[in-house]
Amino acid sequence: MMLEHVLVLGAYLFSIGIYGLITSRNMVRALMCLELILNAVNINLVTFSDFFDSRQLKGDILSIFVIAIAAAEAAIGLAIVSSIYRNRKSTRINQSNLLNK
């Protein structure tokens, strides 16, 4: 596959993730959009790593670290969302003002 096609795919995924993150009112949807952004970054890391120097695995190893960080972020984010849902009975971002009791 050509470099431009993969970069356009990564840009589309990143744009969809940013749009969803900006317009989302639901915390779970915002977490999903954040994961989409991280996956777009991984696609670009692996693509540039293969394009510039295919003998070294720097981009591939960095993308594995990003996947591990994304998994930890998703676990912590879902734990926070479930805790907020237990206390507030809502996962909407604008209804969960944590400063008020």
Curated annotation (Swiss-Prot):
Entry's Gene Ontology cellular component terms: chloroplast thylakoid membrane; NADH dehydrogenase complex
GO BP annotations, alphabetical order: ATP synthesis coupled electron transport; photosynthesis, light reaction
Gene3D superfamilies referenced in this protein's UniProt entry, alphabetically: 1.10.287.3510
Signal sequence residues: none
The keyword Translocase appears for this protein: yes
Primary residence: plastid
Membrane topology reported for the UniProt record: Multi-pass membrane protein
Keyword Signal: no
Catalysed reactions, as listed in the record: a plastoquinone + NADH + (n+1) H(+)(in) = a plastoquinol + NAD(+) + n H(+)(out); a plastoquinone + NADPH + (n+1) H(+)(in) = a plastoquinol + NADP(+) + n H(+)(out)
InterPro entries: NADH_UbQ_OxRdtase_chain4L/K, NUOK/Mnh_C1-like
Membrane-spanning ranges: 2-22, 32-52, 61-81
Assigned EC number: 7.1.1.-
Compartments, record wording: Plastid, Chloroplast thylakoid membrane
GO molecular function: oxidoreductase activity, acting on NAD(P)H, quinone or similar compound as acceptor; quinone binding
Function: NDH shuttles electrons from NAD(P)H:plastoquinone, via FMN and iron-sulfur (Fe-S) centers, to quinones in the photosynthetic chain and possibly in a chloroplast respiratory chain. The immediate electron acceptor for the enzyme in this species is believed to be plastoquinone. Couples the redox reaction to proton translocation, and thus conserves the redox energy in a proton gradient.
NCBIfam families per UniProt: PRK05715.1-2, PRK05715.1-4
HAMAP family assigned to the protein according to its UniProt record, in alphabetical order: NDH1_NuoK
Family: Belongs to the complex I subunit 4L family.
Name this polypeptide is given: NAD(P)H-quinone oxidoreductase subunit 4L, chloroplastic
Protein source organism: Buxus microphylla (Littleleaf boxwood)
Gene: ndhE
